[in-house]
Amino acid sequence: MVTIVFDHPAEDFPELKIAGEFTNWEGVPMKINTSSGKWEYKFDESSVTKHNDKDKVHFKFIDQNGNWFADDEYPKEVDEHSNENNVATLNNEEDGGSAGEEKDEGDKTAHNTNENGSELYYEGPETPTPSLKGNVTFPSPKTAISQDGSAFAKETTRKERKYEHAPLNEVPVERDPKEENKELSPNFSQEQTENKQDKGLDNLSEGNDNDNTRVNEDTDVTDTQESEHEINGSDTENTDMSEQEEIQKIDKPADQNAKSIVKEGDANTEDYESVLKKLLGALGRFFGSWFSWLTTKMSSSEAS
């Protein structure tokens, strides 16, 4: 008898069938072996037709949903219809044998090709475990020098040798330059702030002096231009020569006094008021004489 074992727990499949050359490819229910707890199927070798004196049999499993599949625990082989089936070798002894017992031997011979040239499934030998034994020596951390940081490693080694035997209180303490900069930065920033404040006060005082000077100069020039414009405007009027001479005689002292006051740059309001009063008086006399002359001329023209 030949026994085919489904090498998985029986509870994974509530129902399992097998079909192969020994069942004429019809699904036949498998049975659970109570001792092993796995699905099994037994058949007689006489029910199998041997092809070309090769002791092997092809088969597939069928689950509870009717799906046909080949199990990975058995070697696989593709038939002439491109169907992938499980294959198991048979025992030639008279007392029979088990396909499950011969499964390992079938794995070793599965690399042989069948009659149609199809190659059997074969995983190959296992990779040997590499040995870690050897005479490899690793350099110590103090003497190891890398290609990228050889100079740094040498400098570190020299420093370690230098302070190797020195007492702890004599070993110089290297200070971080960043900390020194942090200690100096407050004094430096305070001096900069004081210098900036002094410069700002000096610039502010100079700006105020310049503004006062400009205001005085602009005021003097404006007053001079206004007075000259008013005087020149009075001289260009079409008046009688005699009246113009009298007006000029009267206005000249006032103009001279106004110009002298303006040139001196006195900013008192009383002086400006007196100058304005004199100018207004001169203008009033001028317009009064001009008006009298105009009325006289108009009356004479009407009489003629």
Curated annotation (Swiss-Prot):
It is found in: Endoplasmic reticulum membrane; Mitochondrion outer membrane; Nucleus envelope. It is a peripheral membrane protein. Residues 73-83, 155-183 have a biased composition (Basic and acidic residues). One of its GO terms (biological process) is nuclear envelope organization. Keywords: Endoplasmic reticulum, Membrane, Mitochondrion, Mitochondrion outer membrane, Nucleus, Phosphoprotein. Residues 129-149 have a biased composition (Polar residues). Coiled coil: none annotated. The modification Phosphoserine is found at residues 140, 185, 205. The keyword Transferase does not apply. Residues 72-269 are annotated as: Disordered. Disulfide bonds: none annotated. One of its GO terms (cellular component) is nuclear envelope. Interacts with ULP1. This is ULP1-interacting protein 4. It comes from Saccharomyces cerevisiae (strain ATCC 204508 / S288c) (Baker's yeast).
